Amino acid sequence: GTNLWKNYSISSNIMLQSSNSGGLVSRVQGVKKYYTYEICKDNKLRIGKMNNEYKILKEIEFQVEFFKEYNLKMMLVNNKIIGYIDNKIVIDVDDFDFPFMKGGAGLGVNNGTLVTEQIILN
C-alpha cells in the first residue's frame, strides 16, 4: 500500500503458531508509525498504536488457540478503528490523540510466526 490510502479495510485469515501476538497493521507510515489489530497469546484481542512507542488503545478478553485459523478484519473510517472476527464487530475505538489518517497496510507479528495465504484490501 501507499501512504495516500485513507479509509479502507484489511482482512486476512491468520494462524498464530508460536508468537506473542500477531495480526493486521494499517495506516502504516514507517517502521514506528502504524495501527495494529492483533490476537495476543495472553488471551487478549487488541487495537494498538505505534507512534515511536507502542500504546494499547483498547483490548478485550479473547480465548486464543495456537494453530487455529482466525478471520480478522480491520476497518478504518476517519479516526475510528473497528475490529472484526468472522465478520462480527468485536472491538472498536476512536483515536483522538493525533490520529493517523493515511498509510499502507500489511501483517505484523511479535516474536514468532504468523501464517496466512492472502490479504484482502477494500
Language model features: what each stretch is:
Residues 93-118:
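Flexible glycan-contacting loops in extracellular carbohydrate-active proteins
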Residues 51-73:
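Short, aromatic/His-centered strand-loop micro-motif at the edge of beta-sheets
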Residues 41-42, 78, 111:
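Residue-level signal for tight coil/turn positions that link beta-strands
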Residues 1-52:
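Secretory/extracellular carbohydrate-interaction modules
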